[in-house]
């Protein structure tokens, strides 16, 4: 059983990407935990584009100061970390809304217990496995919509963002790979 199955065994949407890394699983997973997508110009640009409607509405309503900072990994809750194996983040919300409709989860227990009609749950995992002297790094995103209404609302959003999401995932994996391999080079040089 994969760690993500503990948190989101049922889902209607899924996206999986992977890459090989010349570093030990523990180093790769640590690089994944340390990575911040907000440091990627493409990610920031796509999030800015995604948030244009929210920010425009706030400006029109004279509430520019009430708009949250740009979306990022800080919105996610770390659900579990198994060193050298996997880590899972969770996010809950109405992602199709201009403001993402996020519901703050304080803990893994809150995430597991949450079940509200009209509100989706997302799980994002990074898994590492050693394969022939390399580490296979895989990221999987799953989304569960608890009812027909949320499923119908989320579906067009998923198909709209999925191509960009795939590019972002590939860039994240590449950055984690580079950071992991650089850590090995730096460690070997000292």
Residue ranges, per PLM feature:
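Structured surface interface patches that mediate subunit assembly and partner/cofactor docking
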Residues: 2-11, 45-55, 95-97, 111-116, ...
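Short, hydrophobic/aromatic-enriched beta-strand segments in well-ordered soluble domains
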Residues: 33, 91-93, 139-143
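Glycine-rich, low-complexity intrinsically disordered segments
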Residues: 35, 39-42, 86-93, 104-106, ...
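Hydrophobic-ligand binding "helix-grip"
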Residues: 72-133
């Amino acid at each position: 059983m994969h760690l993500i199955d503990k948190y989101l065994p049922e889902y209607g949407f899924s996206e999986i990407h992977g890459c090989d890394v010349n570093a030990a699983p523990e180093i790769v997973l640590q690089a994944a935990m340390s990575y911040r997508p907000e440091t990627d110009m493409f990610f920031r640009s796509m999030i800015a584009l995604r948030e244009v409607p929210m920010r425009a509405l706030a400006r029109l309503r004279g509430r520019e100061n009430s708009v949250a900072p740009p979306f990022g990994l800080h919105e996610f809750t770390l659900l579990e970390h198994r060193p050298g194996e996997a880590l899972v983040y969770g996010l809950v919300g109405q992602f199709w809304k201009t403001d993402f409709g996020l519901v703050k989860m304080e803990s893994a227990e809150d995430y597991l217990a949450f079940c509200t009609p009209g509100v989706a749950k997302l799980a994002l995992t990074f898994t590492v496995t050693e394969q022939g002297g390399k580490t296979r790094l895989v990221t999987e995103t799953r989304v569960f919509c608890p009812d027909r209404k949320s499923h119908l609302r989320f579906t067009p959003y998923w198909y709209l963002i999925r191509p960009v999401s795939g590019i972002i995932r590939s860039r994240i994996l590449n950055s984690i790979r580079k950071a992991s391999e650089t850590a090995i080079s730096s460690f070997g040089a000292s």
